[in-house]
């Protein structure tokens, strides 16, 4: 098996990862003389800021996803391949993937980050992350299925376990999913589940630090905490989760909370490249790059977004924030630098610009910070809607999301409360199992 892309005479740029950063590079190379190959394990781009709305059954997964091939269908020198990265061999300018190997002139690593369980294997096994569309759909099924089962279960203890929701992580994802589930409890349960007392549903938000939204100002943290408490969310600060057993989330102080809906959004970790030398890894095992996003010591390999860290920026000594705006800015700068390389011009250094931070917890409840301006309430919420709507790919998706938001706003009703358990065809199951055992590099390179 191979990627089946003829090399030709053009310089080839291989991009691994079609998130915000990778897509920005690919779009920025339009009209250039480069051959571009985009590799991603999915055949679509997903919009992470709205994944929590899929998880809460408030939005269709297709509304925040966009097929790569549609985005690039008019590009002659662009190729997409659905595959996973296995290893890189810079000395041979070779990339190993789950479907074979491919040569490159320039390589861009933009695979982003994954959920960080901080080495806790038991929590990793039982907790439900919310980083991808697939994970959000799985979480949606779990939430709805647990509510259904709570009506027919045999004991009060089991019912409480099914209706308790524990969210670990007080960042933007944590406060957003806690807020939207609280709204679901207040508006959906009384309408759809007449034989269920909504007050039995408890939502817990656990944060190891001393405040929510630690990346924002104390004022925004206080505002969000006030909103959530008013919405009935139980907030536990300075509490660390150590384990999950017997349907209980166990805290460091020995206390526990019974639940069968255990959501983990407590940080991210950079995607790892299995054979990359440890010398290239920095804080948080992010790949060290210079001010041009070039991996130190590897002139033709670049890394952008959540996967990389630029050390030495006095304004961000621990690295730039792992946010969409960072990946977009780095991707844009790198695309421009590839154009400059083609013309023999010097590269421009990357300089991060903080465009602001926002978080929403529910209808008319949000916080936003832009430079010295801090907002909360309706206008922050409205600004959040506008910014995210503009960022979604595709006119159809923008229209669908806007109409969905309008419907939910005026009717207090989410219409997607259906449980789907997709069954993969045997051919697909066999192929996935086969690809997990093959194409790991060294054996294939020797052939």
Where is each model-derived feature located?
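FAD-site-proximal beta/loop scaffold in flavoenzymes
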Residues: 125-156, 247-250, 256-329
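Short glycine-rich anion-binding loops that position phosphate/pyrophosphate groups of nucleotides
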Residues: 112-115, 178, 268-270
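C-terminal, flexible cofactor-proximal segment of oxidoreductases
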Residues: 326, 330, 335-447
């Amino acid at each position: 098996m191979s990627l089946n892309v003829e090399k030709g005479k053009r310089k080839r740029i291989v991009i691994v990862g079609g998130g915000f950063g990778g897509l920005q590079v690919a779009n920025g190379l339009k009209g250039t003389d480069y051959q571009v190959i985009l590799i991603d394990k999915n055949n679509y781009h997903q919009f992470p800021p709205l994944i929590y709305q899929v998880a809460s059954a408030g939005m269709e997964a297709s509304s925040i996803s966009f097929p790569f091939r549609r985005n690039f269908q008019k590009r002659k020198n662009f190729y997409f391949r659905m595959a996973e990265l296995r290893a890189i061999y810079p000395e041979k300018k070779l990339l190993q993937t789950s479907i074979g190997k491919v040569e490159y002139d320039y390589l861009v690593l933009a695979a982003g980050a994954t959920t960080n369980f901080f080495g806790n294997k038991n929590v990793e096994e039982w907790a439900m992350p919310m980083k991808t569309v697939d994970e959000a759909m799985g979480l949606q099924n779990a939430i709805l299925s647990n509510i259904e089962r709570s009506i027919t279960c045999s004991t009060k203890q089991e019912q409480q376990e099914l209706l308790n929701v524990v969210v670990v992580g007080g960042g933007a994802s944590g406060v957003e999913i806690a807020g939207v589930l609280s709204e679901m409890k207040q508006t959906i349960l009384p309408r759809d589940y007449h034989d269920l007392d909504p007050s039995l549903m408890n939502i817990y938000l656990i944060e190891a630090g001393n405040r929510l939204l630690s990346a924002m100002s104390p004022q925004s943290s206080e505002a969000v905490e006030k909103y959530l408490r008013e919405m009935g969310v139980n907030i536990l600060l300075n509490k660390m989760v150590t384990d999950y057993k017997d349907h209980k989330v166990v805290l460091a102080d020995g206390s526990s909370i019974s639940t069968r809906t255990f959501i983990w959004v407590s940080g991210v970790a950079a995607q790892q490249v299995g054979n990359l030398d440890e010398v290239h890894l920095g804080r948080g095992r992010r790949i060290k790059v210079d001010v041009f996003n070039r991996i130190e010591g590897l002139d033709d390999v670049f890394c952008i977004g959540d996967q990389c860290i630029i050390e030495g920026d006095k304004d961000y000594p621990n690295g730039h924030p792992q946010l969409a705006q960072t990946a977009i800015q780095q991707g844009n700068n790198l695309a421009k630098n590839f154009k400059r390389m083609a013309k023999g011009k010097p590269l421009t250094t990357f300089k991060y610009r903080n465009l602001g931070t926002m978080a929403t917890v529910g209808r008319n409840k949000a916080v936003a910070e832009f430079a010295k301006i801090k907002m909360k309430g309706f206008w922050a919420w409205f600004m959040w809607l506008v910014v995210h709507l503009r960022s979604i790919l595709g006119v159809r998706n923008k229209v669908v999301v806007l109409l969905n938001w309008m419907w939910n706003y005026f009717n207090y009703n989410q219409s997607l409360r259906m449980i789907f358990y997709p069954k993969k065809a045997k051919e697909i199951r066999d192929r996935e199992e086969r690809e997990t055992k093959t194409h790991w590099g060294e054996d294939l390179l020797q052939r």
